[in-house]
Amino acid sequence: MTFSKQLFLYLFFLFPLLHASHPQQCSSSSCGRDDVHVRFPFWLLSKQPELCGHAGFNLQCTASPKTALKLPNSGTFLVREIDYLSQQIRLYDPENCLARKLLTFDISRSPFSALYLVSYTFLSCPNEVAKSSRFDSIPCLGNSTTSFLATTSLDLAKSMLPSCQIVKTLDVPVSRRVIAKKSRFSTDVNDKDLWLKWDSPSCSDCERDFLRCGFRSNTSLQVKCFPFENSGYNTEPQVLKIILLSIIGPLTIFATCIAVGVCTSERFASLIQRNVAIAALQPNEVIVTTGLDESIIESYKKTELGESRRLPGNNDDIVCPICLSEYASKETVRCIPECDHCFHSECIDVWLKIHGSCPLCRNSPSPARQAV
């Protein structure tokens, strides 16, 4: 074999190896051109792999298209802004009636918490009373006979009794502390955005250093900082990549010119045909990630925790790895066969319906075990 043929074949097999040594990173995505940018710990359900985000941080695109977050027990909200450095997310109601969702708002089963809480008292009043009091009502909650009012002053709310009835007093997540206004009712509770924060996973250090945050490995829920491929920082892998490309580039041009002559020979044509035949016998492996049927999930063992809150088997965790909440007595946990990892039953049920694998070790139970 001549030197030119050896050089061509060397480069032919070298390029796939170089590409394999630098796997594609999880790049940011968005639902629309002017919409929020989505990156770790968030991930878009229809546009990014599940390994690009953390459990509980999955977003989805609406038909608008807008970015939406579905909170357990609280409904779906649209995302107006994500501050990755401060680890805050700003939400608003797509139906422009935030007050209605606040009456049943609950984020205890999500990874989010409030920046600040302001106590609001909601009242229902006959329309005649509301109009005569000259207080602003919340339009989207009222009807032909009843109006709804909201105030940060409990004393003001009590002064409306017995003509009005207190519906509920609740804490509303806001972006800053608010001083209660004792002299008036307000409709701004319906106009405000919800401000939530997350403490885990902690990626603020990565954002501060202009690095991307991600899982340490495919089998770990721990996170670390990685350099962006296009961040412009002079990291060692990037320098090595530039050196390799500066050497391979001229060699590629030289090998291409020689390959034009080589391709005319029957021997080279035979080599190509043989490689194609071998490749045809080796189909690419396709990995499809699907969730499990509810019947299979229900077959996995459930256990009610006692006063010791000790998990079955050799598990010594004190918090659920999915929702990051501590286990409590009388709570129900479900354990995955084979790996024996345990979680809150309501958390792992939702996870397995989407992913079909353990969120800790990423192993899927074998068909034989699922049928048990």
Swiss-Prot record:
Pathway the protein contributes to: Protein modification; protein ubiquitination
Keywords associated with the record: Membrane, Metal-binding, Signal, Transferase, Transmembrane, Transmembrane helix, Ubl conjugation pathway, Zinc, Zinc-finger
MF terms (GO), sorted A to Z: polysaccharide binding; transferase activity; zinc ion binding
Database matches in CDD domains: RING-H2_EL5-like (cd16461)
Enzyme Commission no: 2.3.2.27
Topology of this chain in the membrane: Single-pass membrane protein
Bilayer-crossing regions: 242-262
Cellular component GO terms held in the UniProt record: membrane
Catalysed reaction equations from the record: S-ubiquitinyl-[E2 ubiquitin-conjugating enzyme]-L-cysteine + [acceptor protein]-L-lysine = [E2 ubiquitin-conjugating enzyme]-L-cysteine + N(6)-ubiquitinyl-[acceptor protein]-L-lysine
InterPro entries tied to this protein: ATL20-22-like, WAK_GUB, Znf_RING, Znf_RING/FYVE/PHD
SMART domains referenced in this protein's UniProt entry, alphabetically: RING (SM00184)
N-terminal signal peptide: 1-20
Subcellular location: Membrane
Zn finger (RING-type) location: 320-362
Any GO BP annotation: protein ubiquitination
Keyword Cell division part of the UniProt annotation: no
Family membership noted in the UniProt record: Belongs to the RING-type zinc finger family. ATL subfamily.
Notes concerning its domains: The RING-type zinc finger domain mediates binding to an E2 ubiquitin-conjugating enzyme.
Protein name: Putative RING-H2 finger protein ATL21A
Gene (name only): ATL21A
